[in-house]
Amino acid sequence: MSSPTPFRWLRRPGPHTPPGEPGAYTPSGLSYGADYNPDQWPREVWDEDVRLMREAGVTVVSLAIFSWARIQPTEDTWDFAWLDDAMDLLHAHGITVDLATATASPPPWLTTKHPEVLPQTRTGETLWPGARQQWRPTSPVFREHALRLVERMAERYGDHPALVAWHVSNELGCHNVYDFSDDAAAAFRAWLRDRYTTLDALNAAWGTAFWSQRYSAWEQVLPPRLAASHPNPTQQLDFKRFSSDALRQYLRAEAEILRRVTPDVPVTTNFMVMGETKGMDYAAWADELDFVSNDHYVLPGPQALDELSFSANLTGGIARHRPWFLMEHSTSAVNWQPVNVAKKPGELARDSLTHVAHGADAVCYFQWRQSAAGAEKYHSGMVPHAGERSRLFRDVVALGATLRDLAPVAGSTQKPARAAIVFDWDSWWTSELDSHPTDRLRYRQEALDWYSAFLALGVRADVVPSATDLATYDVVVAPVLHVVPAGLRDRLTAFVEAGGHLVTTYFSGVVDQDDHAWLGGYPGALRDLLGIRVEEFAPLLDGESATVELAGEQLEGTVWTEPVDVVDPDVEVLGWYKTGEQAGRAAVTRRTVRTGDGTGAREGSAAYVSTRFGRQGLVPVLARLLDDAGVRSELPAAVRGDVELAVRTDGTDDFWFLVNRTARPVEVPDVAGDVLAGRRLTASGTSAVTTDGTAEGTAEAPVEGTAGGALLLEPRGVAVVRRPAAPTPPRKNPATAR
């Protein structure tokens, strides 16, 4: 186990464009740019590229991500001349470089000579060249060639004045996280030996007494390849853990070379915290990096903006609320969804600034210039096929100006909320395995629904990995926390006994770290803390539902119900099943936990939600639980749900990001502070605040820097206000908070 890497942001580059000129690198500012692929274009286009980059305010590009075949056209030949030229050209124009190690996709000569590097699927099929990322994470042959390239890149460019960071590979695991080859099998066995030491321990953990699976030699152990029936569930879970670790070990191998050759250059790689990308435990990977980077693409649907905010928030949690790098997102449509929807006016800036609101200090896109050929030619870029005379490029230039205005935000951290949602990769992986009570359960969707409910109520909530210290939070929501080892159970119990308020849901606490059921009734490890007992699950068929009455409202539960028995006198039933097989039984409960006496008395609680309410049904449930915990919205009642509030702080100032989630103007009353971006309403109308604090289009400029009054958020608009830092309120005891 490696120790966490200390946080380091972009290296300050060498001398170049004078500070303050458009496009100049400003160490204290937010970075702006894209993946840049000059090798796709004739040399004369490069000069136009840097001209347009300076016009847009680009300060950083990621370079050479898919350039292995260009850099090393054959096993024994190298061509760095074009890359030298590109690095020098960018540096001459004040544009810094996050330089990729170029190992993302092996060149054809390598896979032709060494087909043994190609991944294999669960059914034994080979993933052939012709796309990208066709390599086994555990292949010693691939690693030998890739690390040779990394060393050459580090030696050649480590001292280049444009270099500000190393970019390891690209989206590790996007297409090759699960490899079932013989290389993977050997590495899996080595990983299992390290984890369990003995076969007896492995047999016990995997429960191999079932179905005559007991192993008598390590060579008998295989990845969960295609089998006659459901593979062993703990074998599946361990293979997911191993696969994530194998990629992490590969990341570490590249990083070790880079740090040995160029110890002053920070190292990162781009995560993919978004949607159902779940094969990589990024909370564990973060310790390998100097700073976290992430790629995110909007997923169309009714929760598209919620999901964007959720993913940005979780990325901040993975980064321990330190600044992180948005390495990729899109200016408009992508190319890989069933229907690739173009962004509407205002969405380019709103989406980008939502990431900044949750801690991003760099905003970058895939890619700079939209490709003319290849699989991603219909994926938008900063310069579209239509060229610079397009609405999209004008929006790109406008966002660059806004990011320059937001320079004071750079280096600030996410201000802790009073509530948090716990996110756990083991529970995600395990709760969705086969041979379960239902295959309709979706872990991330349940977590997202709770986040949507927080947004609807206008209450800030952090999204944090399960290993996070929860002591600073008043309310912690842990949806479908399926895997609860004894240590996590004890942490949650201590949180509640210290006055915290825990909320968890159906199918939580059911198994330990080996996916073995906690015996004695559900919810297993959390049964005593919650003060309830469930004898068996009662999942619902498609089309079935159960009505629950809570606080006078009739709510619909789907997917899952449970016959909940209250076994502790301190449990209050907040919601009752009114229809279905569970009619008359408890559906939502809360146990009050009192510890200590006198001035040291604490009163916490542990609540349980036994059905799936969905994002809308959770709003009244969460409202009741937050009210009882004394957690309130910081937003005016009139804009809750329409506006998201995210807060960053540098200890002296807080930065309020107010995001208009609607397609209409929204007025936010009584917001004091300096307006860094957005519009303030004055007595004579709307004022557009510029970087020097004056207001355009009104006779009442300048606007007072610390003035109150209303903000007008344009449709899909974002305002940023700098205010004196407010102290984080201490946890409130509900006995005095009501």
What kind of feature is each model-predicted range?
Residues 40-55, 146-152, 274-285, 344-352:
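Short, acidic/polar
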Residues 123-291, 295-298, 302-308:
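Polysaccharide-binding and catalytic clefts of secreted carbohydrate-active enzymes
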Residues 1-62, 73, 88-92, 96, ...:
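N-terminal carbohydrate-binding accessory modules
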Residues 48-55, 62-126, 154, 254-261, ...:
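Aromatic-lined substrate-binding rim segments of carbohydrate-active enzymes
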Residues 34, 53, 61, 90, ...:
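Conserved, mostly hydrophobic/aromatic
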Residues 221, 264, 294-738:
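Carbohydrate-binding surfaces of carbohydrate-active enzymes
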Residues 28-30, 57-59, 91-97, 159-164, ...:
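Short, well-ordered coil/turn segments that N-cap beta-strands
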Residues 31-41, 64-81, 128-147, 172-176, ...:
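The substrate-binding groove and active-site-proximal loops of carbohydrate-active enzymes
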